């Protein structure tokens, strides 16, 4: 009998957070209104979860259905309770820009009387972003522009309160991935199709695998 081969992520714990709806927003949508960010986040999150589990990862998801409302604080608390090696927050952007960007907490913020994340989590999240983003972009094979690695402080919410709410309450490395810009015609054409959504999930898997491989000595 041939023993089963361990997956690339055996023993690795990931919290997948399909963004929206939360206490702040229902999320964005394509210009024609036919595709919502909430739907893209959910569909890609489901596909990513299946891929991660197929590679042996333990996966916790922050909500049970697409339309469930979960606060950003609760989402972070789910990742913390699972002692996740990575809290991966899936979002889509809007605006005149294009491409995929990864955000990490670059400074502490304050929300509901809590200051966070800790300096150690900020450092760990930055390191995760530096490994994750290049792997994701490489796996997309030019399908989307590399919009880079950015701090939470560059976002509207993070600029006001110091960091994104999910990052403030995170006690594990936290990344927010703006997978595409739904209001950009190129990005929209890519992510609206099942093939594009599958490609995105596969690329995110590659990012997690790269981070897990780089983290293996301490796993």
Residue ranges of predicted features:
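Short glycine-rich His-centered loop
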Residues: 11-34
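Active-site-proximal helix/loop segments of hydrolytic enzymes
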Residues: 3-7, 39-219
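N-terminal pre-catalytic segment of deacetylase/amide-hydrolase enzymes
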Residues: 1-15
